[in-house]
Design a protein with these regions (language model features):
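Positively charged n-region of N-terminal signal peptides that target proteins for export
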Residues: 1-4
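Periplasmic c-type cytochrome electron-transfer domains
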Residues: 6, 21-462
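Bacterial N-terminal signal peptides
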Residues: 8-17
Length: 462
């Protein structure tokens, strides 16, 4: 009987595929797997109800709707995100570290900034520098109040901006920033020598400006943009009624944020469909994984619609790479403490959102953990995981950079992760749940890449 059922399903699948081939509209190809899934009974109704109740208790619901962004503003933001004109030596764009083909990260443990060569995992150092922290994905981040892994760009509960620019980010600028902290975030990488501004070279007027004169750097970038007729037209369309002479780099940054907030907003994962009432959206293993996630300590930090509390935690990740110039070695990274000055924030970093997380490897504030499964396993007896960290998983050039600061990390690591033990079966279930957080539309973002940009400079593309 079982063999006959399989042949019946094969026949159904082949018939569906043939019908699709003859149809006027393309149809997703039928497979034995999809036929079996269609015949599969839904998971246990009691478990379905329980998981939905647990999710509601932790504020885990649908993502907030994407903000309204005018088409001219989104087009301007797209052009700016992919245009190398924002970098000092015109050799990299925002997208060089936030590549659509790598889930809007770059596929590297640690990025290579200005004056590097190429993009993605094969990017070479050239005359550039290794950036101390992993390039965070920008998928579904518009609702977060803290940007960057240390939260140095923040909008507080009263709507006030707190950034490294201090008073240089003027009230007139902040009034332009429509999309919260996300609107301010793109203002800062172009001011960093290591990230985008680069070192002095012919044609790099940005590098000659003092490091702390952010307002002068922003003005110089706008001078570049306003020298390009197409950008002048695009800014006029995006900000009708604003004279070109009153535009600041806040207008450019806000446009990039508007593009990110709409183009990289994904709310149709199996998990979203489950929350919306589709009892068949999750497989039994994914449902079991969701229940596990919601009943063990994961949910204490990964909660809310983005599955991030938007707060800061020390989860005992090994320190690799050049670091932020902290500690006796100058290769340490004190995390949130670098922003607040509070010793309680030592080695704390922002909780990463988990939507589409399987697309954004590597993981950890410094990309020290290469695979998603390994990152889940890291939370099982995390103290031992740190002490037994295996650098062979890293690219060869980073394997010798693991810092011997494990005792200091463990002295301040969050107690919430103490005592967590995950069996291989539990890891399998959690992994299945993580995959249920992926919107199929996020798997191929090639259409986000423009064919050309107004500067005429090359565009990073696969």
């Amino acid at each position: 009987m079982a063999r006959r059922s399989v042949f019946t399903l094969l026949a159904l699948a082949m018939s569906a595929a043939a019908a699709a081939a003859c149809a006027d509209q393309p149809t997703a190809p039928a497979t034995v797997a999809s036929a079996l899934r269609d015949r599969q009974a839904p998971p246990d109704p009691a478990e379905i109800r329980h998981v939905r109740q647990l999710a509601a208790q932790h504020g885990i619901g649908p993502l907030p709707a994407a903000p309204h962004v005018s088409e001219p503003l989104a087009r301007l933001g797209q052009a700016l995100m992919f245009d190398r004109i924002l970098s000092g030596n015109r050799d990299m764009a925002c997208s060089t570290c936030h590549l659509p083909e790598y889930g809007t990260s770059d596929g590297r443990s640690l990025p290579i900034g200005a004056d590097g060569i190429g993009f993605g995992p094969s990017r070479m150092l050239g005359q550039g520098s290794v950036i101390p922290r992993n390039s965070p994905a920008v998928l579904d981040i518009a609702s977060l109040r803290h940007m960057f892994l240390d939260g140095r760009v923040e909008v507080d509960a009263n709507g006030r901006f707190h950034t490294p620019a201090g008073a240089q980010l003027t009230p007139a600028m902040t009034r332009v920033l429509q999309f919260g902290a996300l609107s301010a975030q793109p203002m800062f990488p172009p001011t960093s020598t290591a990230e985008m501004r680069g070192h002095p070279a012919p044609g790099n007027e940005l590098a000659r400006i003092p490091d702390d004169s952010l307002d002068a750097i922003w003005a110089a970038i706008m001078k570049r943009l306003m020298a390009i007729p197409q950008y002048r037209a695009m800014f006029r369309a995006a900000y009708p009624g604003t004279p070109l002479t009153q535009l600041t780099f806040a207008h450019a940054s806000n446009a990039i944020a508007g593009f990110i907030a709409t183009r990289f907003h994904f709310a149709n994962s199996p998990w979203d469909r489950f929350l919306a009432g589709d009892d068949r959206a999750l497989t039994q293993q994914q449902l079991d994984g969701a229940q596990t996630f919601l009943t063990i300590k994961c949910v204490q930090c990964h909660n809310g619609p983005t599955l991030s509390d938007d707060q800061f935690h020390n989860v005992a990740v090994a320190q690799i790479g050049p670091g932020e110039g902290n500690g006796p070695s100058l290769h340490d990274d004190f995390g949130r403490m670098n922003v607040t000055g509070d010793p309680a924030d030592l080695y704390r970093f922002r909780t990463s959102p988990l939507r589409n997380v399987e697309l954004t490897a590597p993981y950890g504030h410094d990309g020290a953990i290469i695979s998603l499964r390994a990152f889940i396993e890291h939370y099982s007896q995390s103290d031992q995981q740190l002490l037994n960290y295996d650098p062979s998983q890293l690219p060869a050039e980073l394997q010798g950079t693991v810092l011997d600061n494990q005792a200091a990390i463990l002295a301040n690591r969050d107690t919430v992760i103490v005592g967590v033990v995950l069996t291989p079966d539990v890891v399998d279930k959690l992994m299945a749940y993580m995959q249920a957080l992926t919107d199929p539309a996020a798997r191929n973002l090639s259409s986000a890449i423009p064919r050309r940009v107004p500067s005429g400079l090359p565009v990073d593309r696969p």
